Amino acid sequence: ALMSMTTIAFAEGEDAKATNTVAVYDMTVNYGKLADALGLSIDQLESVEDVHKTFCVEMMNAANASKDERKPMVDKAIEKNLKYMHYILNTNQYRKYLLLLNTTMNNRGLNK
């Protein structure tokens, strides 16, 4: 009985660790607040939503990848996201977006 309780406790610990890892990579945002912060037009907002949804999927894929694959996947997702955002946003909007994304990545410990 003691052995099975230890196994359950270990499994719960692993599940919590996996959940925390996935939460760190969850890049879901409130698009209304993002639109306000960046001063987006309706057309820009639609494009930003599409690009950001793809970014969210790529970050979740990275979260679920092996530790060795994770960093290259995150780097590629960020590079692709920034390339598309640079096309959609004007210079001031892009600068603000970079600041927001960089702050988010730093706060989650993803910029190492």
Predicted feature residues:
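Charge-rich (acidic/polar
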Residues: 10-112
